[in-house]
């Protein structure tokens, strides 16, 4: 136990250092300095760790919450940068490999599709909430795994949607409309979907996550499936954690939980089904 506590303390100290360094950056837009620092930060999250961020003290919790905010801003700027770069090219899909962590998006979409396929037939309609300016998740699922499925993408930022709708082949874009909306404003629309994906950065705190899941549970159709991106171990310094208890309280039954292993960089995710009340 003492060794574990020492390891957690060392990890908190390391991420406190990252937080301090990132906070001093004049801009979070992609640059050699920003890219190098965030590459180092992500690498520090990959090894398995005994840390449970819910048990950290108030000072560490405050640092972690601000680090998540900074990472969210940087991720949005990174996606916007690469979205603009790709759509300036004649064939954007031929150049997707330029994006950092491209392989991780490929692997994540395959894992999520495989888990879904184990619990349901191919969905007719899917919603992706928090699609962002570079909607790789829905793009890869629509292109490589679910060629007959309609993907409705929701983001609260109209500028992000404007960028996103330019990415992808024309036949795929025809099945991927984009809507500008806050998740809290989606009600009757949610009942039309067989699957709803909830992006990792929709809801930046545990309370916001819980409220979002409760809202989805209230309006999704009985039997529909929720795929919620989460975080585990040291990755929880970069992304909010979805608590399984909140999934249950939201009216869902957990079907599967996947935590990345080895050198996988992507998020954890939870697959759950709306229970008829």
Model-derived regions: residue spans:
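Conserved SAM-binding loop of SAM-dependent methyltransferases across substrates and taxa
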Residues: 133-148
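Core SAM-dependent methyltransferase catalytic element
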Residues: 256-277
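A short SAM/SAH-binding and catalytic strip from SAM-dependent methyltransferases
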Residues: 183-184, 192-209
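Conserved Class I S-adenosyl-L-methionine-dependent methyltransferase catalytic core
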Residues: 39-121
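Conserved beta-strand signature within the Rossmann-like core of class I S-adenosyl-L-methionine
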Residues: 223-233
């Amino acid at each position: 136990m003492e060794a574990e506590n020492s390891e957690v303390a060392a990890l908190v100290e390391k991420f406190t250092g990252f937080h301090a360094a990132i906070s001093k950056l004049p801009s979070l837009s992609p640059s050699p300095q920003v890219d190098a620092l965030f590459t180092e930060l992500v690498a520090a999250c990959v090894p398995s760790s005994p840390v449970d961020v819910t048990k950290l003290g108030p000072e560490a919790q405050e640092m972690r919450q601000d680090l998540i905010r900074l990472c969210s801003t940087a991720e949005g700027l990174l996606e916007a940068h690469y979205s603009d770069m790709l759509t300036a090219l004649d064939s954007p899909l031929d150049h997707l490999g330029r994006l950092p962590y491209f392989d991780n998006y490929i692997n994540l979409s395959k894992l999520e599709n495989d888990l879904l396929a184990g619990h349901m037939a191919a969905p007719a309609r899917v919603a992706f909430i928090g699609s962002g300016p570079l909607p790789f998740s829905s793009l890869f699922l629509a292109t490589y795994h679910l060629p007959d499925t309609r993907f409705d993408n929701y983001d609260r930022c109209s500028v992000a949607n404007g960028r996103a709708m330019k990415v992808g082949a024309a036949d795929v874009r025809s099945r991927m409309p984009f809507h500008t909306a806050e998740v809290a404003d989606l009600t009757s629309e949610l009942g039309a979907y067989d699957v709803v994906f909830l992006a990792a950065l929709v809801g930046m705190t545990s309370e916001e996550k819980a409220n979002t899941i409760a809202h989805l549970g209230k309006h999704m159709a009985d039997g529909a499936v929720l795929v919620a991106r989460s975080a585990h171990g040291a990755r929880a310094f970069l992304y909010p954690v979805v608590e399984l208890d909140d999934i249950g309280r939201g009216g869902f039954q957990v079907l599967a939980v996947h935590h990345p292993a080895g050198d996988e960089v992507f998020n954890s995710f939870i697959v759950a089904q709306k229970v008829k009340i």
